[in-house]
Amino acid sequence: MKEYRTVAQIAGPLVFVEKTEPVGYSELVNIVTADGTVKRGQVLDTSDEIVVVQVFETTAGIGRDSGIRFTGETIKMPVGKDMLGRILSGGGKPIDGGPDIVPEKRLEITGAAINPYARSSPEDFIQTGISTIDGTNTLVRGQKLPIFSASGLPHNDVALQIARQAKVPGSTEEFAVVFAAMGITREEANYFMADFEKTGALERSVVFLNLADDPAVERTITPRLALTTAEYLAFDLGYHVLVILTDMTNYCEALRQIGAAREEVPGRRGYPGYMYTDLASIYERAGIIKGVKGSVTQIPILTMPGDDITHPIPDLTGYITEGQIVVNRELHRKGIYPPINVLPSLSRLMNLGIGEGHTREDHKKVSDQLYAAYAEGNDLRGLVAIVGKDALSERDRMFLEFADLFEDRFVRQGLYEDRSIEETLDLGWELLSTLPEEQLVRIDRELIQKYHPKYRKKAQG
């Protein structure tokens, strides 16, 4: 391997090297500093005169006299079944004090979106144990369903609760979680590690932690390392894998930082123009392949800057993914956990994974009726602020009280409370029973007579 000393310029995490030999895009580079330290980097861009190398560590110590070695290889993730139960850095190195991973394979981290023709339609219900997701915005195996949050909201707690509780009810197939955190503080990293170890969720998980003071370049490869691991577990070993990526906003900020260092022409709000394509290369790696046992389901979590759902990051994410779960500041102020607002939330694949043979025959109708009643009660709150509660009719007061009851009993649940889908639907019926039967216009009469608490008590009596 030849060594060159042709460093022309250093800008942030980028090293500009005068061209010396043909190099490939994404090729790995070893940079040897004057004191013999070897730093790793990757070819980001190349032209006739200059090669741009992004360094995975700090560029401190790199100078014109540093040696540059082009390896001729791209980044590969060493994978093996013994990765389960391990905590790795954002660059894929063990940080839990355990031994190095003995790889069964080394896989390219770029991966590829699943061929649309080879995709199988998602249809298996995943139970998260959270009523606002399971009951009204159901997650289906093979889906990509993001959580839209904002700074200061408990999205990390929601992510950990899903990682602990997610399962396919009644299934004996192996289930695993790949959890990748990007740009988090050391305090958050310690919190994540302690929770995974304390609750026993680590046994079936692989955890990647990229810290806020780690290089931005590493942040751009962390989700790809996580997805490569998930694809190996799913499509080689037959696991059903849930991938949780948090926080995608930090990932996009890293893209913007690197784009600025490369002096690229910025797009919306300074983010690179190719951010849509870049995000799609991550999100589209979820799915089920026909004839293959495993599956990859994704829950990317992002914080909306300024609580703005029209910001480029949630906006582009919404185009690519199949719905969204919206974490709400107003519910959080009321002390409700998880503060998930079901009204702007949506799961586009929900209807494929619910109903008879999946969850329960009344699931769709109960969900629709809960939505309708809560939406009406929520609208009436605005009216009360203007005319006062006394001006409302008796019917309106019922729906107003229903909205409060829905938030207090259906939305609110404990951090370690794992509700089955039956418990969630029964709770929905309990709340709907506070309304007159003639107001349950979205539920068929035979379902009311079968599941309404009034008729159930008669049947049991």
UniProtKB/Swiss-Prot annotation:
Function: Component of the A-type ATP synthase that produces ATP from ADP in the presence of a proton gradient across the membrane. The B chain is a regulatory subunit.
Subcellular localization, as worded in the UniProt entry: Cell membrane
This protein's record includes keyword Iron-sulfur: no
Bilayer topology annotation: Peripheral membrane protein
Protein name, as recorded: A-type ATP synthase subunit B
Single GO MF annotation: ATP binding
Organism: Methanoculleus marisnigri (strain ATCC 35101 / DSM 1498 / JR1)
GO CC annotations, alphabetized: plasma membrane; proton-transporting two-sector ATPase complex, catalytic domain
PANTHER family on file: V-TYPE PROTON ATPASE SUBUNIT B
Family (UniProt): Belongs to the ATPase alpha/beta chains family.
